[in-house]
A protein has these predicted regions:
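Cyclophilin-like peptidyl-prolyl cis-trans isomerases
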Residues: 2, 16-202
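Bacterial N-terminal signal peptides that target proteins for export
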Residues: 1-12
Length: 202
């Protein structure tokens, strides 16, 4: 099993690459000193996320900007790989890519790890290319952690965790997937983020 995972991990990491889109400006939202709770209502149930602005201030501020603007409402989980992660935050039904704001700095070196239930930013092969797309780890994916400041070792920035609704995450992880155009691992039936909003602080 370990040998199989060692062979698969580089390929799985490559699947977290995102597709670039033109930037669009939006007002920044201040990030409070305590941990925001974001409620994500999906077509398969509700998930609550606790964000860590003390560890990932740039990433949390960026994510909340998208949340507060309603950007995520109506988007889909467009990539689902059992035993790895579920990814969303960039496409509408029909695999229509949404335009995003300017990419942010990668905060993967913040000490947080890609363990089960954590949320992290997806990106292209450029470490500092994350915009709106995120993924929730459904396994302990240590190969996605920051190891060094090289392109290969930079890792994927964790900025929060699931605090309620991990069962919903598992439901999403279990949906049948297939190929849609050039995209693989796409749910055969859309899993829609109906609404994402700031629900309070912890």
């Amino acid at each position: 099993m370990n040998d199989i995972m060692r062979k698969l991990t580089p390929a799985l990491a490559a699947l977290l690459f995102t597709v670039s889109a033109a930037g669009a400006n939006a007002k920044s939202q201040p990030v409070p000193a305590h941990d925001p709770i974001v409620q994500m209502v999906t077509s398969l149930g509700t998930v609550e996320l606790e964000l860590f602005p003390d560890k990932a201030p740039v990433t949390v501020k960026n994510f909340l900007n998208y949340v507060n603007s309603g950007f995520y409402n109506g988007t889909i989980f467009h990539r689902v790989i059992p035993g790895f992660m579920i990814q969303g935050g960039g496409f509408e039904p029909g695999m229509r890519l949404k335009p995003t704001r300017t990419p942010i700095r990668n905060e993967a070196g913040n000490g947080l790890r890609n363990t089960v239930g954590t949320i992290a930013m997806a990106r292209t092969s450029d470490p500092n290319s994350a915009t709106s797309q995120f993924f929730i780890n459904t396994a302990d994916n240590s190969f996605l952690d920051h190891h060094d400041d090289s392109v290969e070792g930079w890792g994927y920035a964790v900025f929060g965790k699931v605090v309620k609704g991990m069962g919903v995450v598992r439901k999403i992880e279990a949906v049948p997937t297939g190929t849609r155009g050039p995209f693989a691992d796409v749910p055969l039936r859309d899993v829609v983020i109906k609404k994402m909003e700031l629900a309070g602080y912890r």
